[in-house]
Each structure stands twice: as structure tokens, then as C-alpha cells.
């Protein structure tokens, strides 16, 4: 549902990379669903390799990163690698937006950003937290 909203609200010239580590989901569902959409790239790989795909698809910087990664259950080194790459490639005025069902890793995420705001989304079941982060 989040993927659909992002696609629907984007400008046509906007390039979007969707990272999905589940091969069946990325190939069978996402690639098929968005095969006729220009500038949408489905990547079956870890988000920690974002630089490789930015180069491949000629994306010089990133305005927004929207993440549903379960940082609470990812190993710290993987989480750290992904957040370091986020710092590296996010535009100075860009935003990293992530949604969580727990705030367990909020302080960990805050280490990588100068500003982090938290909103609780009670319309989601279960309720979720949305962290909006700036460099």
C-alpha cells in the first residue's frame, strides 16, 4: 500500500528505487506491477548497496528515503551500514522517513541525523511511529 501511494504521488520524471530482499515478492509482484512505469526500478538486493544502483540508474542524489526496514530486528552492523549510506547519498535538505511499530531503535537512528521528529499514527493497525529525519 505504501509503494502504491509513493508511485501515485510522484512526479513522472522522478526516479524511484524500490529495494526488496524477498526475490519472489520483488520479481513476481513488484516487477510485474510496475513493468510499464517509467523511472521505477525494482532492486532485489540490500539497501546497503544503494550507491551501486544510483550509479546504474544515473541518480546523482536522493531527495527522500522512505523505509519500512525492521531496524529493531536487524543486526546493528547492517542497520549502521544502511544509515551511513543514507547519510552519504541523501541531499543536504533531504529527508529519511521510516515507520516503526516500536521505538526501540529510535536513539540508534538519532545518532545519524541532526533532527528527528516522531509522530504516532493511530489509524494504522497496529499503531505505528513515523520518524522523519534530517541531516
Where are these regions (language model features)?
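Conserved beta-strand signature within the Rossmann-like core of class I S-adenosyl-L-methionine
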Residues: 17-19, 89-102
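A short SAM/SAH-binding and catalytic strip from SAM-dependent methyltransferases
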Residues: 59-77
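Core SAM-dependent methyltransferase catalytic element
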Residues: 120-135
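A short glycine-rich, Lys/Arg-flanked "PGG" loop and its adjoining helix->strand segment in the class I
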Residues: 79-92
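Conserved SAM-binding loop of SAM-dependent methyltransferases across substrates and taxa
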Residues: 1-13
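S-adenosyl-L-methionine
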Residues: 19-21, 25-60
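Conserved class I S-adenosyl-L-methionine
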Residues: 97-118
Amino acid at each position: 500500500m505504501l509503494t502504491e501511494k509513493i508511485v501515485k504521488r510522484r512526479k513522472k520524471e522522478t526516479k524511484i528505487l524500490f529495494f526488496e530482499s524477498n526475490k519472489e515478492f520483488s520479481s513476481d509482484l513488484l516487477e510485474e506491477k510496475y513493468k510499464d512505469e517509467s523511472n521505477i526500478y525494482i532492486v532485489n538486493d540490500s539497501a546497503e548497496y544503494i550507491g551501486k544502483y544510483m550509479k546504474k540508474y544515473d541518480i546523482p542524489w536522493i531527495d527522500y528515503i522512505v523505509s519500512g526496514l525492521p531496524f529493531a530486528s536487524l543486526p546493528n552492523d547492517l542497520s549502521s551500514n544502511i544509515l551511513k549510506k543514507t547519510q552519504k547519498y541523501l541531499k543536504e535538505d533531504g529527508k529519511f522517513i521510516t515507520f516503526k511499530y516500536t521505538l526501540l531503535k529510535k536513539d540508534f537512528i538519532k545518532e545519524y541525523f541532526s533532527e528527528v521528529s516522531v509522530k504516532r499514527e493511530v489509524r494504522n493497525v497496529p499503531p505505528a511511529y513515523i520518524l522523519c529525519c534530517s541531516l
